[in-house]
Amino acid sequence: MACTAIAADSAFNGRWDITVTNEPRLRAWWLEVEGAGTSSIHGRFVGFPGGNMDPIQKIWVDGGALKFTFDNNRGVHQEYTARLAGSRLEGTMKEGATERTWRGVRAPEIADRDGAAWREGKTVSLFDGKSLKGWRGQVPGQALGWMVEDGALKSTGHANNLETDGKFWNFKLHMEYRVGPKSNSGVGIRGRYEIQILEDFGMPPGTHQNGALYSRIAPRVNASKPAGEWQTYDIRLVGRDVTVVLNGEEVVKGVIEGLTAIATDAAEAEPGPLVLQGDHGPVEFRNITLTALTK
């Protein structure tokens, strides 16, 4: 009987893409579990603790249920519980009197890998320099908070995130952006993986600094320009392979393990939109172009 329980517990192992199911605002989380069915269970999580990829503070399996807890960045205790339902996880998160429900599916294997075989298609402009055509607010009912001025797309700093109407899979993305002192933004590629934008000239590189794959891959060097100067991103995404060139300097070349906190759609095997984060400080964008990559 004990062997059967251990085998059942091991089914929690792996990476899970999670959708919160009882909120009007779409949210996606990510969970990794290792060692379930042994005495050395551990895990990592992207979600409500603060948007980082956090090591799970306490995790265990009890009576066929996976359980883990956090004390989040506001000092609030959170309890997560999940059970297997066929190939899915069905779970809850309790925080005081609030309860959220969620569903997890196994993160997909994505076969596409970057290399010389990929060919560039037609380059398209995603921003016409005059209007918000092709873009929409990510949160329904929330004020947009963006305007177009002098050929640039500008956020006041308390704006709705913007996302493209179109969805994309493998591509090269070029854009120019400008941030003010202490400002913070981000670019969501496929709407799931955030490339950080931060005013951090002269600071050490890190997983939350400019050029990072947010909370996952730190830039190799700090290639940022001072606040108020226009900067460039050239981002290449093929499958899970990502390359980030900041101001002409390659700062990231790696493999994306899973979702970051910008994600609202957990369907990693599907194309997704480009997202511009507008709620963390003033930021401007211009000359946004995308080139599809195909074989």
Where are the predicted features?
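Boundary at the C-terminal end of the N-terminal hydrophobic targeting segment
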Residues: 5-8
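Carbohydrate-interacting regions of secretory-pathway proteins
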Residues: 10-295
